[in-house]
A protein has these predicted regions:
Chain A
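Ubiquitin-like/PB1-type beta-grasp interaction modules and other compact soluble beta-rich domains
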Residues: 1-76
Length: 77, 144
């Protein structure tokens, strides 16, 4: 098992890939996952975060097997 | 199926008619409908095409959640959301929300609710292709 990290839309282009896989560290948060997965870029100000497809804050815990997604404000409809 | 994503062009009016024909006749007295269609202009620029990206799984789940919440807030007979994904062109329908209820108040209010919640929460992203072929991501929704 590991943590799946996904990026969408303009954030995917900015990061340069759609997905990462990280080993769970045991005390991960969503914001911490970003820092480990994208160490060369600060987490964007207006980023939205989803853990297992539910919206979450940056300080929300992340466990082994979780999917964490980062994306810009949504613009559907 | 009250939630659907359409990778190809879809006809909201046909979908609406077909869906309504399966609802119990005489059970509802009001149908409220919103259809969003792609414009060929945005932010002062000519727009030639657009690509709608989504988050498979999360998008459907949140559309489903929005309909469930609407049915808790208002006394509705049924509701429907259809949304286009992938490459689209000006004039193409993007989104359909529809609500059936006994009376117009719940129908109008719930239809607006479905659309506004979709705009705020459902993970879709628009990338526009401008006249000169350049692409840009739409950064925020219009005020309404």
């Amino acid at each position: 098992m590991s943590i799946t990290v996904r990026y969408f839309a303009s954030l995917r282009e900015r990061v340069g890939r759609a997905e990462d896989h990280l080993e769970a560290a045991g005390n991960d948060t969503a914001g911490g996952v970003w820092s480990r997965a994208v160490p060369d870029q600060a987490i964007p100000d207006r980023v939205l975060i989803a853990i297992n497809q539910e919206y979450a804050d940056a300080d929300h815990p992340v466990g082994d097997g979780d999917e964490v997604a980062f994306f810009p404000p949504v613009t559907g409809g | 199926m009250p939630i659907s994503l359409h990778p190809e062009a879809f006809d909201p009016w046909a979908l609406l008619g077909e869906y309504q024909s399966r609802l119990p006749a005489g059970g509802f007295g009001a149908t409220a409908v919103f259809v969003g269609t792609m414009r060929d202009f945005n932010e002062g620029d000519d727009v030639r095409a657009m690509t709608l990206e989504h988050y498979p799984g999360m998008t459907e789940k949140h559309l489903q959640d929005i309909t469930t919440e609407a049915r808790k807030r208002w006394d509705l007979d049924d509701c429907l959301i259809a949304h286009r994904v992938g490459p689209i062109e000006p004039g193409d329908p993007i989104v359909l929300t529809a609500v059936w209820s006994a009376h117009r108040k719940a129908a109008f209010e719930a239809c607006r609710y479905l659309m506004e919640e979709l705009k705020h929460r459902a993970p879709f992203w628009k990338q526009e292709t401008l006249k000169d072929g350049a692409t840009r991501w739409v950064e925020k929704n219009t005020e309404g």
